[in-house]
Structures are given as C-alpha cells and as structure tokens.
C-alpha cells in the first residue's frame, strides 16, 4: 500500500515541476522569435495556381514521365487553405513513389510542416512524419523543434512524444536544442505514466539514451542510465532482438552492464558529476524485476505473434540471454557497491529528473536558440541559391527541348 502512495506523491511532485515552466507568460520553451514565420513567409517564391500544377503533374504521371522536385515544391508553397493540404498530401505520396523520390528538397519538407501548422493540420504533419517511408518526410532539427514546440504549447504531450520517437528513429539528436526539448518531453510524459508496455520501455529507453549521450551533466548521464536500464529490462525479458530490431541500437547484449558502467564512471570521475536518485531507483527496480523467479521462468516462453521469431531467433536467445542471466547476481553486487560509493561522495541528486531537465532547459535553451536561428538563416540563403539554380536548369532544359522540337518540325517539313 505504501509503494503506490509514494508513486502517487512522486507523480504529483513532477506535475508541479512541469507547471513551473509555463507560469511566466505564454512562453513555454521556444521563444516567439524562434517560431516566428515572417522570415519564412517573406522569402522569394513563385506564384502558381494549384489546379495548373496538379494538371501538369497528373499528365506527367499518366505518361510515365518524371515529375520535377520543383513542381511538388511549388505546390506545397502555394497552399492557401486546409483543403489544399489534402491535395498536397496526395502529391507528396505520389512523388515519394516515383523515380524522382530521392530529390524531395529539404525546403519542401520544411514548408510542408509549416503549412500544416499554419492551417491547423498538425495531425496531418504528424501522420506524414510517422509514415515517412510513404511520404518522404525527413525533417531537419529546426523543423522537428517547431513541431515539438507546437504540441508542447498545446499541452499535447502524446503527439510531442511521437515526434521525439521519430527523432530517435531518424537518429537526429545532433543539435543541443533538439536534445533539450526531447528530454523535457520524455520526462514530462514519464511523469504521467504509472506503467509502460515493453514497446514503450524500448522506445523511451532508446530515446533517453540517444538524447542523453551528448550531455555531460546530471540530466544527460541520468538519461543514459535510464535508457540502458529500460533497454536492459527488455533484453532480459524479451531477448536482445526485441531491443535492436527496427531500432537504431546495438545488437550486442549487455544493456544492464552498460547501465552499471555509467554509474561506475560517475563514481570514479574527477569531475563533480551526479546521477538522479530517481534513475537509481529505476535501475534498482529493474534489477529486482529481472531477478525474480517468475520472470526468469517466463522469459523462455515465446510470445505469440512477436515479429515471427523463428528457430534462428530462438538459438540467438539461448546464446545471449543465458549468459546475461548468469551475470545478474554480479550486476546486483556492482549496483549496490556503486550506489553506496555515489552516496558517500554526495553524487546522488535528490531533485526529480523533470525538475532538473526544466532547469537545464531554462539555462541552456536561449543560447541554443541563437545558434539555431543563425544556422536557419544560413540555410534559407542556401535553399534560395539551390532553388535559383534548379529554376535556371529547368529553363535551359525547356529551351533546349523547344529548339529540338523546332528542328524536328523543320526537318519534317523539308522532307
């Protein structure tokens, strides 16, 4: 009875921590300058009627001819209503399944997401992002940030989390601002969840791990530990294939061992590094779960409909899981020793990870915004030059085709 009450108290504290971030005004995470669209809207763009572009693309597809990346770009740029988005979605799908699919421009993807947000179709933006293979929507970090921040400010953390999972799948945690936003969303969502499915444990684990790898601070190191702990639990209960299959993760067993290595590195580091008490409790709970007799006897039972695990995967499980199971007693000893050492060195942070992440976002995000905006402005200039070159090439090809046609017509008349 005491455990659920403690859990409820932790959840309440986390929710209060989350609310502090939005108390002062409307600004939650990204500033108004970051999400402002005036610079984007003021760019030089070509005016076209969507009906003309649609007719042009339809004729090209009917005749099995390639559709230019400029055509789909012009269509997306000239969207003027919510209804136009439906047509644009159709042509994005068609373009993705055409021979020219590799040439969908980055600025077209950026424009598509902005148009969806502009006309209240954030659900369509998320749908095409999640179904990226069908639509070719692979945004850059700035675009990811805009979409994440939009959902955060709407209080829609479920969809914000879906964006984070897509960032994880695309391995796009290269920019600090994306790391901070993602970590905030992850801990905000974990604050609301009392239980996770094994698929959620895998997705949360991978996202926490990859977003925390480049942060050498309490939040980053705790996120690495949290991620390894959740992935280690999945590995022990479902097999290492369930961890790496379809995920940007290593297929080498030993995720719990890697979690313990994080603890040991922090404990032996000359720097004043700390780990969150919360994540140590998580790893403690994982170790207790995977060492319980019920779990160990149920692990060997194949799960019905689980990715069609065949005899080859069964051999893999027998080869990899048994050694990990035999290491669990040593893992427990290492965990207890490292935790004691961390406590002796005063390297255990009592604040919740959501509170720590919120503080980190407030402290670091403004400087990250300045870097992102400078990069974005440079990217706008590069996109403009690339577009100008494509338009020039298009005009040259049209002129060449016109001359060839005229020469052919003249030859036919002469004959």
UniProtKB/Swiss-Prot annotation:
Coiled-coil ranges per the record? 369-415
Cited Pfam families: MRP-S27 (PF10037)
Q: Which GO terms describe its molecular function?
A: rRNA binding; tRNA binding
Name one cellular component (GO) term. mitochondrial small ribosomal subunit
UniProt keywords, alphabetically = Coiled coil, Cytoplasm, Mitochondrion, Repeat, Ribonucleoprotein, Ribosomal protein, RNA-binding, rRNA-binding, Transit peptide, Translation regulation, tRNA-binding
Is-annotated flag, keyword Acetylation? no
Q: What is an annotated GO biological process for this record, any one?
A: regulation of translation
Keyword Secreted among record annotations: no
Compartments where located: Cytoplasm; Mitochondrion
Q: Which cysteines are joined by disulfide bonds?
A: none
Q: List the InterPro entries.
A: mS27/PTCD2, Pentatricopeptide_rpt, Ribosomal_mS27, TPR-like_helical_dom_sf
**Which regions does the record annotate with the repeat PPR?**
105-139, 140-175
Boundaries of the annotated transit peptide in chain numbering? 1-17
The source's domain of life comes to: Eukaryota
Family per similarity comment: Belongs to the mitochondrion-specific ribosomal protein mS27 family.
**PANTHER family in alphabetical order:** MITOCHONDRIAL 28S RIBOSOMAL PROTEIN S27 (PTHR21393), SMALL RIBOSOMAL SUBUNIT PROTEIN MS27 (PTHR21393:SF0)
Free-text function comment from the UniProt entry: RNA-binding component of the mitochondrial small ribosomal subunit (mt-SSU) that plays a role in mitochondrial protein synthesis. Stimulates mitochondrial mRNA translation of subunit components of the mitochondrial electron transport chain. Binds to the mitochondrial 12S rRNA (12S mt-rRNA) and tRNA(Glu). Overexpressed in hepatocellular carcinoma tissues compared with adjacent non-tumoral liver tissues.
Subunit record text: Component of the mitochondrial ribosome small subunit (28S) which comprises a 12S rRNA and about 30 distinct proteins. Interacts with NOA1. Interacts with MIEF1 upstream open reading frame protein. Interacts with METTL17.
Name-wise, this protein is Small ribosomal subunit protein mS27
Record organism: Mus musculus (Mouse)
**Protein's gene:** Mrps27
């Amino acid at each position: 009875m005491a455990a659920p009450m403690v859990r409820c108290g932790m959840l309440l504290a986390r929710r209060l921590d989350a609310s502090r971030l939005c108390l002062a005004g409307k600004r939650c995470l990204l500033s108004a300058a970051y999400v402002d669209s005036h610079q984007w809207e003021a760019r030089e763009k070509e005016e076209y009627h969507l009906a003309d572009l649609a007719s042009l693309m339809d004729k090209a597809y009917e005749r099995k001819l390639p559709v230019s990346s400029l055509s789909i770009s012009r269509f997306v740029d000239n969207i003027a209503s919510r209804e136009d988005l439906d047509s644009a979605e159709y042509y994005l799908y068609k373009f993705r399944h055409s021979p020219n699919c590799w040439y969908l421009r980055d600025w077209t993807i950026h424009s598509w997401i902005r148009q969806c947000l502009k006309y209240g179709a954030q659900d369509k933006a998320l749908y095409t992002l999640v179904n990226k293979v069908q639509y070719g929507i692979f945004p850059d970090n700035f675009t990811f940030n805009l979409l994440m921040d939009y959902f955060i400010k709407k209080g829609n953390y479920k969809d914000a989390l879906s964006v984070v999972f897509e960032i994880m799948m695309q391995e796009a945690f290269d920019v600090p601002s994306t790391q901070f936003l993602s970590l905030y969303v992850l801990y905000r969502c974990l604050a609301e969840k009392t239980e996770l499915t094994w698929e959620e444990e895998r997705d949360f684990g991978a996202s926490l791990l990859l977003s925390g790898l480049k942060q050498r601070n309490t939040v980053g190191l705790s996120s690495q530990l949290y991620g390894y702990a959740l992935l280690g639990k999945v590995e022990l209960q479902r097999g290492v294939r369930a961890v790496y299959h379809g995920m940007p993760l290593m297929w080498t067993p030993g995720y719990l061992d890697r979690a313990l290595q994080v603890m040991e590195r922090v404990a032996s580091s000359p720097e004043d590094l700390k780990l969150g008490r919360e994540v140590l409790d998580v790893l403690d709970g994982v170790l207790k779960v995977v060492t319980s007799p019920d779990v160990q006897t149920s692990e060997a039972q194949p799960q019905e409909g689980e990715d069609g695990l065949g005899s080859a995967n069964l051999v893999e499980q027998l080869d990899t899981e048994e050694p990990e199971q035999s290491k669990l007693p040593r893992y427990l000893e290492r965990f207890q020793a490292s935790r004691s050492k961390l406590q002796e060195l005063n390297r255990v942070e009592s604040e919740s990870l959501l509170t720590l992440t919120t503080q980190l976002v407030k402290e670091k995000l403004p400087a990250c915004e300045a870097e992102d905006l400078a990069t974005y402005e440079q990217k706008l200039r590069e996109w403009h030059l690339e577009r100008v070159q494509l338009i020039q090439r298009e005009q040259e090809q049209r002129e060449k085709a016109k001359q060839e046609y005229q020469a052919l017509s003249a030859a036919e008349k002469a004959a």
